[in-house]
Curated annotation (Swiss-Prot):
It is an enzyme of class 3 (hydrolase). Residues 505-734 form the AIG1-type G domain. InterPro entries: G_AIG1, GIMA/IAN/Toc, P-loop_NTPase, TOC159_MAD, Toc86_159. It comes from Physcomitrium patens. Mg(2+) binds at S521. Binds 1 Mg(2+) ion by subunit. PANTHER family: GTPASE, IMAP FAMILY MEMBER-RELATED, TRANSLOCASE OF CHLOROPLAST 120, CHLOROPLASTIC-RELATED. Residues 1-177, 325-431, 758-795, 832-871 are annotated as: Disordered. This is Translocase of chloroplast 125, chloroplastic. Residues 132-150, 328-353, 770-789 have a biased composition (Acidic residues). GTP binds at G517, V518, G519, K520, S521, A522, H634, E682, N683. Residues 151-167, 389-401, 408-429 have a biased composition (Low complexity).
Length: 1141
């Protein structure tokens, strides 16, 4: 280090002698410029290196002198830059400060700095030929310029570049910056040499102290007239020579001779003639450079910092520290611009980055000063803007030696292509990027107000998600300036907070839900630090939905306070009424986030809150939990004892309670992926307070700031999602939006296993049911008609009935009921007999004259269509309305074969006009032997539309063989499912029918296919057994299912209407076995029809219902008094409802 300082002092003394004698220098000598003494302040505590920053006071009289000589400097220096030009850049401020990097220690010839390793002068070597400005030799060089040719002219041009900045440094005490001064010597102007040439000729390439031409625009390498002095052998020899001769007064002359000697020997070995320029004796004196000259160690450091971000930042009055967490991103951005140096002419990209850099330097310099010197301003050294570096490189390449750079045409073409591609970007992308940056600034301002640093987990996660969403939405075009986005946003957030504290366009609306007595209203009061709502520890204080608004830290916050909910299963009706009020209220004011409140000290291991959470899910939908935060009050409660009898830790207690609440929400929402954030709250007046006056939890964290940060972060992410339109713009191939889902196999399998009736011809549609043919041949003809065997019967008049006794009247009624039953049975048998005869006649006629049955059927089917008859009234539910509009649902059948009817919502509130869709049906015959039907229904409410369409046709192809085909369209969720099915039924035996079918469903770009097999067996006259099974597969998934149904009919069915059915169903999907059983029975008790139903599954859930209908037992109406009395008792005493206040 001492040797380098001596070397610098030798160069300064030599400069003082040569300054006046140089004929090429048109600038004023540094000694002629009056200067104030150098002021050295005390040690800067913020400086990481601990060095004393140097402040140079520039007097006002220097400015006028420099302005006079500026024009002359530009003419004489050419592309160089004088000391007076540097003074002009410092006019905006009278004090310029800089702090060069300080070497901490030397390791293997390298100086170790705080943020990296910089090569020492001895190890770096010399990167080509040095051009020394010796006065005598310069005159000889001008005389022999015509003989030297191109190489000599290049040397003369470079020798004209004077460095008055070196003389400026001579007047200062910069002995402590020997390393940096030495690095300044190695700056050159080899702009005409490309990177490819440097790689192809490694033996001629010298390593520079700074990154060199590969990393610095315009190049920092030495001239290329003596390229062959770059071998490690003479570098080590040169290093030894430096160390041995630094203390010698003639070290520079010997050094110059040594350079010439070593270079000559090396070129002699290569048989290459090299023309050396005139080498002056002052090695550390003036140095020829290109237009981007560096005047001092601090300036050199600023230029190197532009391409190497690992250097420690300079401490100046206009420089702000960069957040530690984003240093790596800045380094990555620097590498991006370094790698694309050769063809980097993208003005749009440079403009984006220059915008961030220029905004960061507005305070310290004017625009004109920044343009004149990108690396120097009134406030001290700064990073040069990259677009000006590119222009400097191009100007140096065209003015150096006239040798064209390789691949110039291709580079220009690629640059033009790049410019065209960037210019083709729509203005919408730039607008989105600007708005997203404003969102970042807004969030950083909110975080500052909440005293949260960018290293906070929530803040960092939100910023990461914003960057990720921006990348997914805009691709690489929006990702180029990612390294500058945070620094720029953070600086603007700090400036806006300092200038306009109240000017923050942000408001948050929060919906509060939770059980009664958990502290919802108390939390609202704690957040506003004032009593906004009335609270009570003994009874619920909030009786209706209302809004509480105020300002917290300059942010408008609005709470929607709701009455407390009750956790009991019997109170869910009360909860539904409250949530319907909330749902009606939020239609006017939409909330940004939902807070679900619960108590921290509620130790419940059961699923008692599941009914409450499911009620919330049913009313608001499962999406209510996607933007919800769990708030646990009474967070200062001491943890209970663990299983071993010792109190558990506070963190473990919080994690255990949070996990239980989150698991309950997942169970109620039906989504195992939910992970709602949890925030802790303590509203007790005796809560601990820190030095800042904030209420803190037992773990020392202020809960108010954390809760507000979660709410604000959710609102910020929602704004970004709305701006970027991720869900709308996403496709199934992208991470967001609709993805290809597995079809609902259990639902489709249940539809496949369902038995469907075969279509019949119009003349065959007189049977009672599909099973009427099964027992038509089994009627006992030998029994005859019992009604005909009865003795004659004379009905009695009313007077005669009054004369009879009670027993006689009862016997008369029984006799009359038996005769009525036998008469109905006789009519039923005659109907079956006629149908059998008609079938036989149709089969015979089809064999003899195929055309006659068709014509007859056509006439018979067309005759009733020509007469308009009233249709039967629709079955309406019982209603106590005085104006029940039954007349609205009576229609007339027209001659048109299409039947169109409205669809009535029987359970809707609108009894006057409760239409929500229409139904279309039509039956027709294809080719006189294939019956077909088409039906469809469309329903629409305010939110959803349902579409159901079905087309079916039956084809008979032999005795007892029928094939049914169909096409269905139905709405499943938000998608349409298209199903094609076909099944064939054939008779194996007289009492056995077998059905086999296939189906295929197309849903959401997925096809699900399945098969089924069904067998129907009749056992005697009263028992029917149906067994079916099937499998459905789609997208690698499978579902298996089957069912068994046994039916027992009464002796006189269908006259007696006695029927009992036992069913069992099994389904296996994803290894989850679902078993269900159901039982249904109906029978007559006198003239009262009794119907009982019961079902149970393997998960323990079931249902039992009993229904009785009678036209004689009017006392059954008294059963309706029971629910009326229960409602009155609940309203009076509060059982099952809201407690009375």
């Amino acid at each position: 280090m001492d040797a380098l300082r001596k070397l610098g002092s030798l160069g300064r003394r030599r400069d003082e002698v040569d300054t006046a004698s140089s004929p090429l220098k048109n600038e004023a000598s540094a000694a002629e410029i009056p200067r104030d003494p150098v002021q050295i302040s005390g040690k800067d505590e913020a400086s990481p290196s601990g060095l004393t920053p140097i402040r140079v006071r520039v007097p006002e009289d220097v400015r006028s002198e420099s302005e006079v000589k500026r024009d002359g400097d530009e003419e004489s220096v050419g592309s160089g830059e004088s000391f007076d030009s540097a003074l002009e850049r410092m006019e905006a401020s009278s004090i310029t400060s800089f702090e060069p990097p300080s070497p901490m220690e030397s390791i293997d010839g390298r100086f170790q700095f705080e943020d990296g390793v910089r090569e020492d002068l001895a190890e770096s070597g010399l990167d080509g030929n040095f051009s020394y400005d010796d006065d005598d030799d310069d005159e000889e060089e001008e005389e022999d310029g015509s003989e030297e040719g191109e190489s000599t002219s290049s040397s003369i041009i470079n020798s004209e570049y004077s460095s008055s900045a070196s003389n400026t440094e001579d007047e200062m005490d910069i002995s402590g910056y020997g390393a940096s001064s030495a690095r300044t010597m190695l700056v050159s102007n080899d702009a005409s040499k490309s990177d490819e040439e440097a790689i192809d000729e490694p033996k001629y390439k010298l390593r520079n102290v700074v990154t060199g031409e590969e990393n610095m625009s315009g190049g920092l390498s030495v001239e290329n007239e003596a390229r062959g002095v770059a071998l490690s052998s003479w570098k080590s020899e040169l290093e030894d020579f430096y160390e041995a001769s630094l203390e010698d007064n003639d070290v520079q002359e010997e050094l110059a001779e040594k350079i010439i000697k070593v270079a000559s020997e090396q070129n002699d070995e290569e048989d290459e003639e090299v023309h050396f320029p005139v080498i002056a004796n002052e090695l550390p004196g003036r140095i020829t450079r290109n237009r981007t000259m560096i005047d001092s160690p601090a300036h050199l450091y600023s230029a190197v910092k532009a391409v190497d971000s690992t250097l420690p930042a300079l401490k100046s009055e206009s420089t702000k520290s960069i957040t530690q967490g984003f240093v790596e991103a800045e380094e990555a951005e620097s590498d991006v611009f370094t790698e694309g140096e050769d063809g980097y002419d993208d003005e749009d990209e440079d403009g984006d980055i220059q915008m961030d850099v220029s905004q960061a330097t507005e305070k310290s310099g004017t625009p004109d000063e920044s343009e004149s010197n990108p690396s120097m301003g009134a406030g001290g050294p700064r990073l040069p803007s990259l677009p000006q570096r590119s222009s400097a490189r191009r100007s140096a390449a065209t003015t150096a030696t006239g040798v064209p750079r390789p691949n110039t045409a291709s580079s220009t073409q690629s640059a033009a292509t790049s410019d065209a591609s960037i210019s083709s970007e729509s203005s919408e992308a730039n607008e989105i990027r600007e708005k997203l940056q404003n969102i970042r600034i807004k969030f950083l301002r909110l975080a500052r107000r909440l005293n949260q640093s960018p290293q906070n987990v929530v803040v960092a996660q939100v910023l990461y998600r914003l960057g990720l969403a921006e990348s997914l939405r805009g691709g690489s075009s929006l990702n180029r300036t990612r390294a500058f986005s945070f620094d720029h946003a953070n600086a603007l957030a700090e400036e806006q907070e300092a200038a306009k504290y109240e000017d923050l366009d942000f408001a948050c609306t929060i919906l509060v839900l939770g059980k009664t007595g958990v502290g919802k209203s108390a939390t609202i009061n704690s957040i506003f630090d004032e009593c906004k709502t009335v609270t009570s520890a003994y009874y619920p204080s909030t009786t209706k939905v209302h809004e509480v608004s105020g300002t917290v830290l300059g942010v408008k916050v609005r709470f929607i306070d709701t009455p407390g909910l009750l956790p009991s299963t019997a109170d869910q009706r009360h909860n539904k009424n409250i949530m319907r009020q909330v749902k009606k209220y939020i239609k006017k004011v939409s909330p940004d986030i939902v807070l679900y409140f619960d108590r921290m000290d509620m130790q419940t291991r059961d699923s008692g809150d599941v009914p409450l959470l499911r009620t919330i899910t049913d009313v608001f939908g499962a999406a209510v939990w996607f933007n919800a935060t769990v708030v646990l009050t009474h967070a200062s409660k001491a943890p209970p004892d663990g299983s071993n009898g010792t109190p558990m830790s506070y963190d473990y207690f919080v994690a255990q309670r949070s996990h239980f609440v989150q698991q309950t929400i997942r169970q109620a929402a039906g989504d195992a992926r939910l992970q709602n954030p949890v925030s802790l709250v303590e509203n007790h007046p005796a809560c601990r307070i820190n030095r800042s006056g904030q209420r803190v939890l037992p773990n020392g964290q202020p809960w108010k700031q954390q809760l507000l940060l979660l709410c604000f972060a959710s609102k910020i992410l929602a704004e970004a999602n709305t701006l970027l339109k991720l869900q709308e713009a996403s496709t199934p191939g992208k991470p967001f939006g609709q993805r290809s889902r597995v079809p609902p196999l259990p639902y489709l399998l249940s539809s496949l296993l369902q038995s469907r009736a075969q279509l019949k011809m119009p003349d065959e549609q007189h049977g009672e049911s599909e099973d009427s043919d099964d027992d038509s041949d089994e009627e006992d003809e030998e029994e005859g008609d019992e009604y005909d065997d009865l003795p004659p019967f004379r009905p009695l008049s009313k007077q005669e009935l009054e004369d009879l006794s009670k027993e006689q009247r009862q016997e008369y009624a029984e006799e009359l009921a038996d005769r009525e039953r036998l008469f109905q049975k006789k009519q039923y048998r005659e109907q079956i007999r006629r149908r059998r005869e008609r079938k036989k006649q149709a089969s015979v006629m089809s064999k003899e004259e195929p055309s006659i049955p068709g014509d007859g059927a056509e006439d018979e089917s067309g005759q009733p269509a020509t007469v308009a008859v009233p249709m039967p009234d629709m079955a309406l539910p019982p209603s106590f309305d005085s104006d029940n509009p039954t007349h609205r649902y009576r229609y007339l059948e027209t001659a048109n074969q299409w039947l169109v009817r409205p669809v009535l919502e029987t359970h809707g509130w609108d009894h006057d006009a409760g239409y929500d869709g229409f139904n279309v049906e039509k039956m027709f015959v294809v080719k006189e032997k294939i019956p077909a039907s088409v039906s469809g229904q469309v329903t629409k409410d305010k939110k959803e539309a349902q579409v159901n369409f079905e087309a079916a046709a039956s084809l008979r192809h032999g005795e007892g063989k029928v094939t049914l085909t169909g096409f269905d369209v139905q709405t499943i969720g938000k998608d349409l499912a298209y199903t094609v099915r076909a099944e064939t039924r054939f008779n194996n035996f007289k009492r056995n029918k077998t059905t086999a079918g296939v189906t295929a469903t197309y849903l959401n770009d997925t096809i699900a296919a399945g098969v089924k097999l069904e067998d129907r067996v009749l056992i005697g006259k009263r028992v029917k057994l149906v067994v079916n099974g099937g499998v459905l597969t789609g997208k690698g998934d499978k579902a298996y299912g089957g069912s068994l149904e046994a039916t027992l009919r009464g002796k006189e069915y269908p006259l007696s209407r006695t029927l009992s059915t036992l069913g069992l169903s099994v389904m296996d999907w994803h290894g989850d076995l679902a078993i269900g059983g159901n039982l249904q029975s109906q029978f007559m008790v006198g003239k009262t029809m009794m119907v009982g139903r019961a079902n149970l599954n393997n998960r323990g859930s079931g249902q039992v219902s009993i229904r009785a209908s009678s036209s004689e037992q009017l006392q059954m109406v008294l059963i309706g008094i029971v629910p009326i009395l229960r409602s009155l008792i609940n309203c009076r005493f509060g059982f099952g409802g809201q407690p009375q206040q």
